[in-house]
């Protein structure tokens, strides 16, 4: 087998293995951090199993020959948008979560599925940018209903990256698609002006509170978690530590610096940044495993000229800057499934020249 086909499965397997080792080393009965341990155990199972599926996909000649499969994937965003519209008609003005978790989690899942859905149409014979942007419109509609700031900022950037990668040799199509994307974004802003404005004002208030030593806000708590997580890592960069040990360190730091108290609410969850979370629990090995995964995704996307995998990777890395998605069950399943689907789709033809 070509060595390049081992890099991505190995990076996925490494994360799963480290999570399993960490769980086995520190999980005890009746732990107050049971949810945290089981979230990592679920990720370990999914990534270890998923690494073999990804390896088989990379080393096989499996192709998606029928375009009907691509159109089925393309329809996913519209099905999600339709369901979101129905939920919104019942619970108007609430952040939608599809009843399966948080609104933020729903946004991340929708964006990752939307990337697969949008990229699928670019591999068909009717790969007009209008169809891609129609998908983007459906995804942005759902993201606006979740009112998740990170995805509302990140997804348009991903759309632009996809258009540049796919239509860079067709200036006319590229220009018209960018103009249409701007029009779609403007429409979303106009339609959802009130909730977007509210979330924007909340962000400004959160930042203002944080500068005034109050981190008990959404953004303030994130910034406090980043500071605490880095502090914990720097004190012992080569060590694994339990969830209990990390929480104890968080409490000690807050006792010294009360302005960081907003982070304590999430001591039994995660630190809302992939690198900081990995470093705070698994030290340098945790950070290396996360960066290795990112590198492997970009590397395979480049080597296989896989537009879809490149765009998905941008989404995974982008979300990882402000949250943790390599965690728990649902989103890791989506990530592994998306990688496999995009690799299979890419076997039809190459799209990055």
For each feature predicted by the language model, list its residue ranges.
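Aromatic-anchored transmembrane helix interface
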Residues: 7-23, 30-57, 68-72, 77, ...
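Long extracytoplasmic/lumenal interhelical loops at the membrane interface
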Residues: 216-220, 224-227, 234-235, 241-282
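Transmembrane alpha-helices of multi-pass inner-membrane enzymes
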Residues: 312-317, 326-353
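Juxtamembrane "helix-exit" motif on the non-cytosolic side of transmembrane helices
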Residues: 21-32, 85-94
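Transmembrane signal-anchor hairpin modules in multi-pass inner-membrane enzymes, especially those
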Residues: 1-26, 57-67, 71, 121-130, ...
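Alpha-helical transmembrane segments of multi-pass inner-membrane proteins
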Residues: 49-92, 103-168, 191
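Hydrophobic transmembrane alpha-helices and their immediate junctions
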Residues: 173-176, 280-314
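A membrane-periplasm/extracellular boundary helix in multi-pass inner-membrane enzymes
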Residues: 166-212, 230-234
């Amino acid at each position: 087998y070509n060595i390049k086909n081992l890099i991505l499965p190995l990076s996925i397997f490494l994360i799963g293995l480290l999570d399993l080792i960490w769980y086995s080393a520190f999980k005890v009965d009746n732990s107050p951090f049971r949810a945290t341990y089981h979230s990592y155990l679920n990720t370990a199972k999914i990534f270890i199993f998923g690494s073999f599926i990804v390896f088989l996909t990379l080393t096989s000649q499996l192709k998606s020959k029928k375009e009907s499969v691509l159109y089925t994937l393309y329809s996913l965003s519209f099905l999600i948008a339709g369901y979101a519209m129905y939920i919104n008609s019942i619970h108007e003005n609430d952040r939608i979560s599809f009843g399966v978790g948080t609104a933020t989690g729903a946004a991340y899942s929708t964006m990752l599925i939307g990337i697969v859905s949008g990229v699928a149409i670019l591999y068909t014979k009717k790969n007009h940018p209008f169809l891609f942007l129609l998908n983007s419109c459906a995804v942005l509609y759902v993201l606006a209903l979740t009112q998740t700031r990170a995805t509302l900022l990140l997804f348009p950037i991903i759309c632009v990256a996809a258009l540049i990668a796919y239509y860079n040799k067709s200036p006319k199509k590229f220009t018209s698609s960018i103009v249409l994307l701007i029009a779609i974004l403007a429409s979303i802003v106009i339609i959802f002006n009130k909730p977007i404005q509210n979330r924007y004002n909340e962000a400004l208030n959160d930042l203002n509170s944080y500068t005034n030593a109050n981190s008990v806000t959404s953004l303030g708590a994130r910034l406090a978690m980043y500071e605490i997580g880095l502090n914990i890592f720097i004190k012992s960069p080569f060590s694994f530590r339990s969830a209990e040990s990390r929480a104890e360190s968080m409490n000690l730091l807050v006792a010294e610096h009360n302005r960081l108290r907003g982070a304590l609410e999430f001591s039994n969850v995660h630190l809302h940044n992939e690198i900081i979370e990995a470093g705070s629990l698994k030290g340098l090995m945790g950070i290396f495993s996360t960066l290795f995964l990112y590198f492997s995704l970009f590397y395979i996307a480049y080597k296989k000229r896989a537009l879809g995998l490149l765009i998905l990777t941008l989404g995974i890395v982008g979300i990882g800057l402000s949250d943790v998605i390599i965690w728990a069950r649902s989103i890791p399943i989506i990530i592994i499934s998306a990688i496999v689907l995009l690799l299979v789709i890419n076997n039809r033809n190459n799209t990055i020249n």
